[in-house]
């Protein structure tokens, strides 16, 4: 048996301002840091001992990872940071206020961009040139993604980096983002394209899965429930 714990980063500045974030590299708020400490204590109380931690290339997730590991007194754990665990790329919506986008594009269209599994947001003209992505082939860097595309981006990392550890009986910790974790939950629980709309992970919330030797889910649950509004459910 092995356990997987997945954690969504604490509240970011963009969550606070109600703006689309995606691959924008925004900081945690004071509340977000507090949420990270709280979920770290929740995980410690549950008694998990991890072999590896996985996170994205975005500092809101990286810092949450470090705070959680500090609370666990496991700062020496091996950590892998991967662009494949980045948040879903919101394309040209990045940086826009969510209320403003409803006014410009309409409530129905914005809801479709946010919640549909296959809907694409308006794309950026160019993909990211940030130095952190220098090892990622230009053709692999998105200019905007549907949740389906973000899931396909995530899958190779899950299969190649996380699953082998679980199959070896080693507990794994993933600290990532709202949409990334929804995609992972969809894969683990085999949720339909339609039903994934109702799945949420709050800022500073941890979910756990206990797997059998064949990666069958034996047990699952939520360790901590953050407090957030509907506007904070992504990014």
From Swiss-Prot:
GO terms for molecular function: phosphoglycerate mutase activity. InterPro entries: His_Pase_superF_clade-1 (IPR013078), His_PPase_superfam (IPR029033), PG/BPGM_mutase_AS (IPR001345), Phosphogly_mut1 (IPR005952). The record marks 177 as: Transition state stabilizer. Pathway: Carbohydrate degradation; glycolysis; pyruvate from D-glyceraldehyde 3-phosphate: step 3/5. The active site is at residues 9, 87. It holds the Pfam family His_Phos_1. One of its GO terms (biological process) is glycolytic process. Gene3D superfamilies: Phosphoglycerate mutase-like. Keywords: Gluconeogenesis, Glycolysis, Isomerase. It catalyses: (2R)-2-phosphoglycerate = (2R)-3-phosphoglycerate. CDD domains: HP_PGM_like (cd07067). Substrate binds at residues 8-15, 21-22, 60, 87-90, 98, 114-115. Its EC number is 5.4.2.11. HAMAP family: PGAM_GpmA. NCBIfam families: pgm_1 (TIGR01258). Catalyzes the interconversion of 2-phosphoglycerate and 3-phosphoglycerate. Belongs to the phosphoglycerate mutase family. BPG-dependent PGAM subfamily. PANTHER family: PHOSPHOGLYCERATE MUTASE (PTHR11931). This is 2,3-bisphosphoglycerate-dependent phosphoglycerate mutase 1. It comes from Latilactobacillus sakei subsp. sakei (strain 23K). The gene is gpmA1.
């Amino acid at each position: 048996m092995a356990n997987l714990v997945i954690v969504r980063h604490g509240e970011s500045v963009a969550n606070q301002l109600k703006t689309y974030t995606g691959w924008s590299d925004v900081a945690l708020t004071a509340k977000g840091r507090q949420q990270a400490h709280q979920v770290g204590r929740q995980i410690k109380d549950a008694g998990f001992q991890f072999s590896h931690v996985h996170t994205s290339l975005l500092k809101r997730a990286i810092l949450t990872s470090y705070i959680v590991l500090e609370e666990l007194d496991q700062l020496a754990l091996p950590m892998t940071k991967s662009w494949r665990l980045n948040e879903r790329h919101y394309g040209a919506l990045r940086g826009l206020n969510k209320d403003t986008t409803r006014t410009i594009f309409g409530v129905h269209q914005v809801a479709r961009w946010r919640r549909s599994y296959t809907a694409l947001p308006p794309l950026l003209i160019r993909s990211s040139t940030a130095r952190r992505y220098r090892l990622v082939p230009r053709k692999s860097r998105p200019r905007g993604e549907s949740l389906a595309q973000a899931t396909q981006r995530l899958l190779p990392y899950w299969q190649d980096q996380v699953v082998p550890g679980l199959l070896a009986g080693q507990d794994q910790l993933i600290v990532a983002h709202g949409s990334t974790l929804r995609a992972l939950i969809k894969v683990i629980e085999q949720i339909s394209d339609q039903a994934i709309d109702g799945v949420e992970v709050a800022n500073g919330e941890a979910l756990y899965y206990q797997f059998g030797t064949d990666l069958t889910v034996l047990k699952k649950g939520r360790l901590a429930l953050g407090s957030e509004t509907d506007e904070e459910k992504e990014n």
